[in-house]
Amino acid sequence: MHSYRERLSVPVGWWVLAVVCVVLLGTEVWAGLGGFIPVLTYAVLALIVGAVLVNWSAAVIEVTGGTLRAARATLPLDQVGKVVALDEAQAARLRGPRADPAAHLLLRPYLKRAVYIEVADPASKVPYWLLATRRPAELAAAIQRSHETVG
């Protein structure tokens, strides 16, 4: 049973923008060179842009069974300290000037809000996790609820 699950999928607008960029760049090559090269350019650009967007969409944040999973990383909820839902400005500070290089970050350029999760395990070299999310209040509440039942 999942108490929280969110796929960090790329917004539709980004896919539309990607298609427009591929068409424009491919057209530039076609106008300059003609022949088979533009077809190859369209294909290569589409594959690269598509692979990047699909890769970004693959990340899942999940709170279930006493564990927080963010993409491939896991954190037992009994090692969780303070949990804070961050607005855009707070998240920007922790992504930028106030970032700790040892922190675990799962960020996406199209998600501006995040959740700060303090790692309470003294043996861990990771001071906190910063997870981008569309629903920071829900994620923070799910972590706190699950942490209370585990801890």
Model-derived regions, located:
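Non-transmembrane, membrane-adjacent beta-strand/coil modules in membrane-associated proteins
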Residues: 71-130
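Hydrophobic, well-ordered secondary-structure segments
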Residues: 20-21, 47, 62, 116-120, ...
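Short acidic, gly/pro-rich beta-turn/loop elements at beta-sheet edges
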Residues: 16, 127, 139-141
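Conserved beta-hairpin
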Residues: 44-84
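Pocket-edge structural micro-motifs
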Residues: 6, 119, 133
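Cytosol-/stroma-facing membrane-proximal "stalk/adaptor" domains immediately downstream
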Residues: 132-151
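Short, aromatic-rich membrane-interface segments at the entry and exit
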Residues: 34-42
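N-terminal membrane-targeting/pre-transmembrane regions
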Residues: 1-33, 151
